Amino acid sequence: MGPHIFFRVEDEDSRARYSDEEGLFAEDTDTWVNFKSRDRRLLGQVERHLDWGNRVPTPFISMYCDEGVAHREAERRVGEGKKDVRVYKINMRKSDERREYRNIRLLAERLDFDIPEHAWNNSEYEYIFLHHVPYSAVVDWIDL
């Protein structure tokens, strides 16, 4: 069983967004995804999500299972001049809905693809969630 506490870093340019009283939403909530698949479609979706230059919406929301990693990422963004930097704390045991999520390194290994160099360091702690994380799971946040 994986972790149940996660941290989402968001800023003015984040593709996935928090909505008051609804939760966190991926930019694309319509695309069907089967995490158990090994087909090229899933691989393409995950690769696009990890490509920071990609402008095509993806059905994923990135989060970290390590608070220190999330806060370092948030501080990096502040240092780059990003505005509206916020770290959300997510407790999936508080969620009133079941959600699907996977560790990015384990998924990359199963799909046999290389994580981009710029994303490698944090990927050990990174999880991608499918479509939506309900408001009930968002237990706290801090603004930087």
Predicted regions and their residues:
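NAD-dependent ADP-ribosyltransferases
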Residues: 1-144
